[in-house]
Amino acid sequence: MLRFRLISGSLLASAAIVALPIVLAQAADDTFMTMAKEYVAQAAAPVTTWTGPTTGPKAQTGKLVIYVSADQKNGGAQGVGDGAQEAAKAMGWDFRILDGQGSVPARSSALTQAIALKPAGIILGTIDAAEQAPIIEQAVAAGIKVVGWHSGPAPGKINGVPGVITNITTDPLEVAKAAGLYAVVDSGGKANVMLFTDSIYAIATAKTNAEKAAVTGCAGCKVLSVEDTPIGDLSNRMGQLTTSLLSKYGKEWTYSIAVNDLYYDFSAPPLQAAGVDPAAGYPRQISAGDGSVPAFQRIRDKRYQIATVAEPLHLHGWQCIDELNRAFAGQPPSTYVAPVHLFTSANIDKDGGAQNIFDPGNGYKDEYRKIWGVK
């Protein structure tokens, strides 16, 4: 009898030891899911408070600013240019937009043309600063002030390209984290994710790495593949790639996360052709930027996209002008970084979403006008 009790006790102890890692793993995953839900809720909350600068130099006068867009088909680059143009008008500055047309040679040509116009400042609209470093340094040597939007992997100074005064962006790692965690939450912790990126851009690579970290932090989720497809050639590649991935992964593929909404402009037709339900079918598509007009429409209509982590494009355009104004006045950058914001069908008509853009209701235009001393 004593021996039986000893054996039974040993078996119970062994069972407890075996079960302990399972219990700990479950607790860790519960903690991760709680964190993910809280993060997503905060990212989707209304934006009502201005957290940017409240002091700075008054408007400098008589300036010409050139906005060099990497590709005006990119809704993000186009939107920032629109915001910068509006802010430049408030300043009384001359403003021009040049289109890099989605290729390295065309971007180089547009930058060279911008320098020839002898502006006071150049804004890089999602032009990778490392890619165009020699021409940027030519601009700086000519006395031109240069700021970037999505021109490097993080806000602030860009390593290796000291001539760029500051890089303006929502923190891309937080943008990517929001996209990744939304897939985790929406799936109930069971997302099988395809990641779409463009390694030409350092910021895209940084986003993709952060998306992967967010997804793989969930024990029941996994990344199926990372697909590196140039944004500038999506119209030719994305349709066939989507069809190929559907054939390879079938129903195992439940979520997509792309570094830009533009990917889904071209994935929707093959999904429809494959009989995927636009609202309830899989894969469910999420974008880690930038909040394009078609993306807002897809989310509102529940057609092949469930979320975008939108950039405040017009706000960023105004910030570009503010940072140039600070540089013209001999002052340092503001270091302002706008917080991330997640749009889903639940909040798609808030914070500018009704107009198909993330335009925060925090009074940023009035705040910048007060700093500059203009109406």
Per-range role (PLM):
Residues 3-6, 26-375:
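A residue-level marker of the well-folded mature domains of exported/periplasmic proteins
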